[in-house]
Amino acid sequence: MQYTYQHIQDLVPGPTPQNFYGKIIFIKKKINQIVVLIKDETQSIYLRVIPKEDQELEFQLRQVVRVHRCKIQSILNSKEGIAQIGLFGCHLIAWSQSGKVDNPVIISSRSWTKSDEDSERLQTLRKLGKSRRKSGRKTSVDTMANKLIERREAMFADTFIKSLFNKIALSRKEHLSRNARELFYHRPGDIVETQNLLEIDDSWFNDENSEQFVQYVLNCTTCHVEYNHVEYAQNNIPTNCRFCQEAMESFHAAFRIRISIETYGVFLTIPLELIKTELDICEDWDSESNIVEEEEKVTRFKKNIQEKVRDASIVHIKGISSLLLIIMLNINSISLVNNITENKRILLQKSNVPSSLQLKILITPFVIVVVRFFGITWIYSGSSCIEEVLNLIDNCSRRR
């Protein structure tokens, strides 16, 4: 079979196998392959030689190589040859610096044939850099080639790893989005099965953050149902509704919970008048009391909530209408959480949970859901907020 040989500078990356000659000027052995830098009178190219499993190829510097049916690919804005011996007829022949044409030192295929161009190419390539190498010392060419190979491999590895991590991150975001969708896509009263515990960020219960987890909330009873609108009081003073301009008569303090999730945060704000606990850590709230009395109750509640709700985890969500918090007051209570079987419906009855560790928060349609998604905050409230939050998560996922 008559082969057509190209100069290295004329090699074109693509699926078509190509044939060429070159002189080895650098060798670097890898685990399952050999990287050689070969050159001709036009250019140089890196060649990755992948032998067969039972084959050993001993390359030496200044050998002249003839490569048949080699794949040329583009990598990092340069060309690279891949010679996988035996694949699609790929094979190579190598001659020593002073060997004869009929006596090659490396033969990767038993069916090799001599080409009419062998003699001419051997004479030409043997003259390249004939007197530049000094015995026993590495030349600057070797040092530079070694650095280039290591740099190319590092850049290739970095590019591959970045691409891999981007795919993993995208898959993770989609997974979290689906989990959030499942969390909110339930009617009030439905049971939600959680795959794992949703941790509450206890940093909100520090003294310096007390104003963030206990706040004053204004609810306009005139347009609340129509607009699903809830505002926080400024300086603890009720104001008029910005939609209907009517005075907001409903005024109460609220307990705000932040659930720790990797990519986004979900905030639940529950009016304290709706909290009922067997610990009796707060009294029934009187919405008709004046602001001074409300402030006194909030102060008492702050001191108790920092002790009772620290290190809490949400283990059961009954729709958006109720939460069950297990308060881990000591080491013994941690075993209660560890004994919960994942991926199953979690129903903690009063009989098997000590009353001193149980805090149940009943949430009416007044509940406020504050969703912080990719650094942006939306506030929803009322019984129809579930669909709005669901659409919000979908839209944010598409934009990302």
Swiss-Prot record:
One of its GO terms (cellular component) is chromosome, telomeric region. One of its GO terms (molecular function) is C-rich strand telomeric DNA binding. GO terms for biological process: negative regulation of telomere maintenance via telomere lengthening; telomere maintenance. Transmembrane segments: none annotated. Expressed in sperm and oocytes. Telomeric DNA-binding protein, which binds to single-stranded C-rich repeat sequences, with high specificity to the 5'-GCCTAA-3' sequence. Repeat sequence binding can be at the 5' or 3' telomeric end. May have a role in protecting the 5' end of the C-rich strand of the telomere. Acts redundantly with pot-2 to negatively regulate telomerase-mediated telomere extension. Also regulates telomere length by the telomerase-independent telomere maintenance pathway called ALT (alternative lengthening of telomeres). Through sun-1, anchors telomeres to the nuclear envelope in embryos. It is found in: Nucleus; Nucleus envelope; Chromosome, Telomere. Belongs to the telombin family. Its main location: nucleus. It comes from Caenorhabditis elegans. This is Protection of telomeres homolog 1. The lineage of its organism: Eukaryota, Metazoa, Ecdysozoa, Nematoda, Chromadorea. Keywords: Chromosome, DNA-binding, Nucleus, Telomere.
